[in-house]
């Protein structure tokens, strides 16, 4: 599932796609 800001999460983990997220830092 995609939450915006480069963050994607599955049932047991989540990760950040920094190539997308860095625009919001």
Swiss-Prot record:
Name of the molecule in the record: Bacteriocin mutacin F-59.1
Protein's UniProt keywords contain Lipoprotein: no
Regions crossing the membrane: none
GO cellular component terms given for this protein: extracellular region
Gene3D superfamilies assigned: 1.20.5.130
Principal place of residence: secreted
An annotated GO BP: killing of cells of another organism
Location of this chain's protein in the cell: Secreted
Keywords: Antibiotic, Antimicrobial, Bacteriocin, Disulfide bond, Secreted
Disulfide pairings: 9-14
Origin: domain of life: Bacteria
Family that this chain belongs to: Belongs to the bacteriocin class IIA/YGNGV family.
Organism: Streptococcus mutans
Function: Bactericidal activity against a wide range of pathogenic bacteria, including Bacillus spp., Enterococcus spp., Listeria spp., Staphylococcus spp. and Streptococcus spp. Has no activity against Lactobacillus salivarius, Staphylococcus aureus, Streptococcus pyogenes and Streptococcus suis.
